[in-house]
Amino acid sequence: MGFSGKISSSFLRQSAVVQIVLVNAVVFVIVHIAALFGIGYVGEWLMLPQSWTEVMSTPWTLLTYMFAHFDFLHILGNMLCLYCFGIVALDLMTPRRFVATYIAGGLAGAAAYLFAAEFVPSPGLIGSSAAVMAVAAAAVLTKPDYHVRLWLFGLVKIKWIALFYVAFALLATRADASAVCAHAAHLGGILADRKSV
């Protein structure tokens, strides 16, 4: 088995949560390496544009935006929460359903963002926040008192982690008019797939 075959085999042995985290991490690294070599448009190529008209000419962005990040704290916060809620969600649903929930949340977030962008100018959308919020909502709505062990805090109910994550997502968004569109995407993700489990 060649090197690429070993990597592929190792990837497929991971849980669905780890697979999505790895895809996000690899895309993040590729975007930043490309930027170092003056190929900054790679990130823009993955970003969801601000209008349906532009999306029609770049339809792949409906999927790619939810696996891409520009900012380290953005990907770190999203992946930590995805891992935390994903472990719970995988106890409640199949891996296939888990991935479907992630993608449904991302697509719902994209639709909500594009609707809001019709009224408020925005530069485009990137990041997995909406998709992660769909996973978090699926876990919290089913098992709000489920405990996870956090390194510094011990056992914590996931409903409190979800509350912190939503607050983090809202506070981490730029404090300008375009933030309305980002918040719309987050809300779209939360409401995306409440019947997942």
Task: Write out the residue ranges for each language-model feature.
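A detector for small-residue-rich transmembrane helices and their helix-helix packing motifs
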Residues: 1-196
